[in-house]
Structures are given as C-alpha cells and as structure tokens.
A protein has these predicted regions:
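SAM-dependent nucleic-acid methyltransferase catalytic core
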Residues: 1-4, 60-184, 188-194, 211, ...
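Short active-site oxyanion
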Residues: 12-16, 38-40, 158-162, 214-220
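Short His-Asn-centered micro-motif
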Residues: 19-21, 44-45, 165-167, 185-187, ...
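Short catalytic/ligand-binding loop motif for oxyanion handling, primarily in non-cytosolic enzymes
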Residues: 25-29, 50-53, 122-125, 173, ...
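Conserved beta-strand scaffold positions in the cores of enzyme catalytic domains, especially
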Residues: 41-43, 164, 240-243
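Long, positively charged, glycine-interspersed low-complexity recognition regions
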Residues: 198, 202-269
C-alpha cells in the first residue's frame, strides 16, 4: 500500500514529516531522486522504543554491530535451540516493562527491540506476543533487517533522515509546518487505538488531529479506514478523497479467501 500512497506525494516538497512514523514504510517506498528540493526528513513516534530505533538507524553501521552481537535462529536448523526463545522472553520483558526512555541512541536496546518485533506474527502486539519458532524453514526477519543496514539504497534512506522526534503528533506537525512541508499522517485507525503499542489514542485525539490538519500551511495526506465523522471533519467537496482495496496481510491464511480492506487517503491538495 505504501507504493500507492507515495504516488500522490508532491515532488516539490522541502520538508517531509510522518507524525505517526511507526516503521516509516511510506518513506522507505519513496524514490528520493524524485524530490530534488527535499532538505529535511522528519521521523516521529510517541513510542520511545520506535524513537530510539530510528535514532540508531541514522548510524546504520553502529546499529548493525549491535545486531551482530546477538545470536538468532537460523535457516536450515530445524531444531531451534531453546536459548533463542529464552532470549526473546528476556528481551521482551526488559524493553517493554522498564519504562524505557532514550536521551541518546541506545544501540543495544534497539537491537533487543528489533529481536522481539521481528520474531512475532506481523500485525500482533510485540509486548504480549509469543516467540515464533521458524523451525529452520524460513530466514529470520531479524537477519533481513540487519542486512538492510548495509545495502546502499537502504543506507541512503537511513542516513538522509535529518530529525527523529518523540513528540505528540500536534506538537510535531506545528513544529515542522511550513508552506513547503508535506505531512504524511497514518494515525491509529478509528476504534483500533488500543491495538497500538505504548500509547493511547481516543476520539478526542482523532478530532484534535483533524483540527490541526485543517490549519496547516503545508500539504497533507492522511490515510484512514472510513468512518462517519471523517465526512464531517474533511468534507469531500473540500478535500480530495482516494480509495484503494488491499489484502490484509496480517489476516491472511493459507487456502482461505483473502480478507480485503479499503485504504482511504484524504488530501488538502
């Protein structure tokens, strides 16, 4: 879905922000050569573990060294040693229950966090999910992430991130807003807020987001699932609405009908 979204990005932007950065997938889908005026790339996430991970990603070689220091389950080894599950539980308990705050890049904590989130089912809550024993059938996603830290195209994206923030979305948008800013907003979806890790996001926050976006000087694109109040906050005769059907990967099961969803992109341009 990221490739579909970035097709709508204005190519004359000078500042790019994601107030709900998550894993920054839309940014990583951008062909940076198409944005010759882009001077500032801003990642933000209210989750301090995501914030710390992306502070570390700005120095990919140092983060790669931290990831290399932690053994992980291997392709072709069907009898996964118990130490990997034990390490997963240890790191899961440590990073999610410690009240972690990062004032400077903490590479080892970033590696431990990556160890957990790459070994749970896609779309699940990493703080409560169980370890996936791949039984040697697949390559661990932890290793795939580690490899990206030395691949030129990925390294270019990592090192061009200019600012990493741990702010409330409104503070982030106001701080970086300008006539040449593009805000991509992927807010927690309506009625699924408790699904997201390390923060709450309620009806009041959805309305607060709508209010701040209505006042920006720059351009914004916001992805959501459709719900009734959106039509009040962003009337279709005042904002551009685009829709796309997509397969819900997290809900897909073998030999069953694919579960489909509709992604909605609302723009002020």
């Amino acid at each position: 879905i990221g490739k579909w979204l970035v097709d709508y990005y204005p190519q004359d932007m000078e500042v790019y922000t994601e107030a709900f950065g998550g894993m920054f997938w839309c940014y990583f889908n951008m062909d940076l050569s198409l944005y010759p005026n882009l001077k500032k790339i801003v990642y933000n996430d209210f989750n301090p573990l995501n914030y710390n991970l992306f502070k570390c990603v700005q120095n990919p070689s140092e983060l790669q060294r931290a990831l290399d220091s932690i053994p992980v389950q291997q392709l072709g080894v069907s009898n996964t040693p118990g130490e990997f599950r034990d390490r997963f539980v240890e790191y899961q308990t440590e990073v999610f229950n410690s009240g972690f705050t990062a004032n400077s890049p903490d590479y080892l904590t970033a590696a431990k966090y990556a160890y957990v989130v790459t070994q749970v089912f896609s779309g699940s809550k990493p703080e409560t999910s169980s370890f996936i024993d791949l039984k040697g059938k697949y390559r661990c996603k932890y290793l795939s992430f580690r490899d990206k830290l030395s691949k030129p195209d990925w390294v270019e994206h990592f090192t061009k991130i200019t600012d990493v923030e741990n702010l409330d979305f409104e503070d982030l948008i106001v701080k970086y807003d300008s006539p040449t800013t593009y805000h991509y907003v992927d807010a927690p979806y309506w009625k699924t807020e408790n699904y997201y890790s390390n923060h709450d996001f309620d009806r009041q926050d959805h309305e607060r987001l709508a209010n701040v976006l209505q006042q920006v000087k720059g351009k914004f694109g916001m992805s959501y699932y459709d719900f009734e109040l959106l039509h009040t906050w962003f009337p279709e005769n005042q904002y551009k609405w685009e829709r796309k059907l997509f397969a819900k990967a997290a809900a897909a099961k073998k030999n069953t009908k694919q579960n489909m969803g509709e992604e909605l992109l609302i723009m002020n341009y």
